[in-house]
């Protein structure tokens, strides 16, 4: 008799110290990990970042507040995301008594990994003392798998605040204490024509930071762009340090972080009257002009009751878009690795269109960012531009379409998009209109944006809707990683064939989308079921209705296979055009029309145009 082997797991507690941060790491079971080389791990401890060493002049502050944006810390965890609201702290600072003080911060993730951080606060009475803050900055792991297919999201536009608001004419000094790359500081206003960016050198030189454009100073919110690590550097705890020095003319940033006290935030901003404030969670940060302060909540028809509701909505949106991209924090394949990054949303009086996406931020073309505080199609459309990549570009023109695919599947998901609204419309209600131009001979690239989207959604909905897009992205990344080069239309055809074992070339060609000869040969040699447009194939209305009812199909222009048509003895006519200089050379020869291995009909060539009638499915 065989005996069962019982494995006893021992949990070991290790206390480690890195850059003054203590991590109590609980080595839990890694059985949940889907790929041993992915970033995901039960052993990953949270990191604490923000103001990690502080010096202030005696009496410059009435009191020390750990929520003061200048002195605040935050926490994030690769698996759990933002943990800032989970931070616990102890310790006090007497701002009127010279001395060294300590604030201890502690945060624990869902795998019971604990990170502790002691922040030293020095109160000095030196005459020329200024506020001095050392800030720890997080870094972002490589997103090589998204880079290789051109999916940028806002990966290289993730920014961290410095806790300050710079009034017009006010400057600060800054330098890098520890980083192996230069860092970029950008001043955000509500007009790109009123802002610049500056670079902090990794050599540690002090830089005077001030937003002066063409000799004119402007108030602004300085943000520093998060560094993205190389593929070889997989240290998720890697941080950089910078040092800031400034006087009392530099203002505390009016700042709201997810789950903060909204009333306190609004009251403080009303009191300060700073020209800009900042709200954020782990997926989105918005620089808000003072004029929009009362337009963020309870203002728009499709607006939000609280700032947390707003931030939660965009968290759901971005999470869902990541799912539609086919990426995961705990992937089975490394090509599907996800990494959390944050979108910057801003007003820009000199932007483009109504709103725009430019790779490192989303802008509202106005001096107001208020429009982004409403649940609407525009927000989905612009955020999703970051997800297009090379699969959304190419000969099959999807420039303003690939992003709308994501927007569509989110908008019809009423667990996320809770207001009424469907930019595309119900497929069975719009299909006659959307197929009109196609049947008149227009190519896919000649269609309007809405019709192009309809064509894709009609295809995806035959399978698994948005999940089909996710599976296609997974397939596509794997192909590109293996060194292949594909047009987007060939990628669509090959992906559907490999994933679902169907040939969609007839559907693609019905929209006059050109598939390469190489791909045609490859797919037709598979002898897999072909999918075509139902109403294109069946002209008899009685037969059409029998198929619709019998197969529980809602769309006349939905996709069907020949096997389905055979069940209803459907027949159709086929027009063949032979392009040759002298068709007489082919007289007497025959053409076999086949479906897989079955010969449906044999016709003799006697003209350059041949009409085949009553062709069985």
Predicted region positions:
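Solvent-exposed, low-complexity, repeat-rich "mucin-like" stalks and linkers
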Residues: 32-81, 164-165, 174, 570, ...
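Serine/threonine-rich, repeat-prone extracellular segments and beta-strand-based repeat modules
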Residues: 79-124
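Beta-strand-enriched, solvent-exposed domains that form extended recognition/catalytic surfaces
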Residues: 111-117, 121-254, 575-617
């Amino acid at each position: 008799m065989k005996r069962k082997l019982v494995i006893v797991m021992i949990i070991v507690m290790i206390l480690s110290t890195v850059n003054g941060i203590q991590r109590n790491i609980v080595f839990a079971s890694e059985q949940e990990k889907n790929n041993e080389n992915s970033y995901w791990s039960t052993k990953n401890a949270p990191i604490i970042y923000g103001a990690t060493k502080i010096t202030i002049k005696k009496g410059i502050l009435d009191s020390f507040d750990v929520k003061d944006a200048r002195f605040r810390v935050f926490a994030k965890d690769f698996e759990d995301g933002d943990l800032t609201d989970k931070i616990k702290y102890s310790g006090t600072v007497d701002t009127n008594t010279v001395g060294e003080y300590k604030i201890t911060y502690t945060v624990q993730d869902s795998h019971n990994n604990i990170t502790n951080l002691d922040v030293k606060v020095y109160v000095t009475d030196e005459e020329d003392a200024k506020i001095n803050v050392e800030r720890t900055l997080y870094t972002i792991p490589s997103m090589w798998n998204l880079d290789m297919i051109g999916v940028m999201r806002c990966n290289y536009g993730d920014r961290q605040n410095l806790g300050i608001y710079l009034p017009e004419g006010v400057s600060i000094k800054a330098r890098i204490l520890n980083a192996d790359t230069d860092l970029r500081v950008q001043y955000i206003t509500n007009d790109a024509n009123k802002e610049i960016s500056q670079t902090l050198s990794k050599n540690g030189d002090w830089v005077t930071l001030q937003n002066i454009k063409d000799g004119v100073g402007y108030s602004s919110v300085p943000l520093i762009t998060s560094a993205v690590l190389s593929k070889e550097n997989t240290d998720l705890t890697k941080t950089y340090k910078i040092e800031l020095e400034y006087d009392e003319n530099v203002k505390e940033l009016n700042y709201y972080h997810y789950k903060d006290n909204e009333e306190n935030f609004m009251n403080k901003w009303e009191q300060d009257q700073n020209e800009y404030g900042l709200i954020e969670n782990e997926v989105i940060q918005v620089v808000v002009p003072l004029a929009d302060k009362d337009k963020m909540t309870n203002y728009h028809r499709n607006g939000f009751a609280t700032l947390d509701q707003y931030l939660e909505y965009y968290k759901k949106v971005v999470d869902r878009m990541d799912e539609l991209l086919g990426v995961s924090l705990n992937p089975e394949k490394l090509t599907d690795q996800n990494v959390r990054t944050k979108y910057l949303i801003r007003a820009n009086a000199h932007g483009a269109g109504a709103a725009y996406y430019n790779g490192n931020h989303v802008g509202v073309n106005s001096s107001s960012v208020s429009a982004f505080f409403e649940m609407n199609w525009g927000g989905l459309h612009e955020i999703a531009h970051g997800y297009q990549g090379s699969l959304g570009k190419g000969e099959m023109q999807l420039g303003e379409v690939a992003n709308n695919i994501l927007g569509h599947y989110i908008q019809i998901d009423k667990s996320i998009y809770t207001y009424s609204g469907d930019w595309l419309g119900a497929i069975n209600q719009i299909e006659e209109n959307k197929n009109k131009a196609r049947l008149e001979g227009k190519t896919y690239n000649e269609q309007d944006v809405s019709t192009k989207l309809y064509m894709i959604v009609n295809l995806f909905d035959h399978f698994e809707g948005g999940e089909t897009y996710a599976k296609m992205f997974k397939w596509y990344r794997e192909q590109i990683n293996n060194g292949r080069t594909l047009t987007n239309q060939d990628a669509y055809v090959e992906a559907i064939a490999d994933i679902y074992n169907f040939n969609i070339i007839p559907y693609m060609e019905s929209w006059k989308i050109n598939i390469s000869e190489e791909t045609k040969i490859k797919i037709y040699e598979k002898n897999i079921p072909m999918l075509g447009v139902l109403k294109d194939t069946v002209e008899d209305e009685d037969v059409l209705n029998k198929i619709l009812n019998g197969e529980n199909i809602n769309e006349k222009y939905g996709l069907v296979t020949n096997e389905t048509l055979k069940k209803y003895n459907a027949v159709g006519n086929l027009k063949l055009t032979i392009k040759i200089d002298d068709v007489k050379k082919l007289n007497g020869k025959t053409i076999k029309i086949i479906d897989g291995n079955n010969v449906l009909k044999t016709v003799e060539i006697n003209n350059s145009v041949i009409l085949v009638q009553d062709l069985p499915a």
